[in-house]
Amino acid sequence: MNFSDRLQQLPSVAQLTALHVSSADGQALTTLEPKPGQAGSLVIYHALGVLYGGRITPAAARLGLEWYAEHHADALAHPGKHPNIDRLLACANSGSVLLVRAVAA
């Protein structure tokens, strides 16, 4: 399944204005918003947070990488081009955990 099709299968983020992503020790890493260039990542990170209780574990990160579909391969070929995918790659490879907190509209 490609990225666009996968996004249609995941929970809606219409009720969100943002999603804060932090390290396990609470250090702010990024804020995803429903705007061009971030909307797909907002959907994926939100869905992972819902499935895994607000924690993106290495297993959750690997699932998220599958959901990014063709963009995952592009991120591997061009490190730094897709920072939200790079973050999941780092989580999956390092064993670290990310925390996500949704901000409702």
Q: Model segments located where?
A:
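N-terminal, charged low-complexity regulatory/assembly segments
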Residues: 3, 28, 32, 43-47, ...
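N-terminal secretory/membrane-targeting helices
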Residues: 1-4, 64
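Amphipathic alpha-helical interaction modules
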Residues: 20-56
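Short, charge-rich, low-complexity alpha-helical interaction segments
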Residues: 3-27
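Intrinsic-disorder-associated interaction segments
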Residues: 9, 37, 41, 57, ...
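Short, charged, surface-exposed loops that flank catalytic or proteolytic processing sites
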Residues: 55-63
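Surface-exposed polar/charged interaction patches
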Residues: 10-16, 54, 94-98
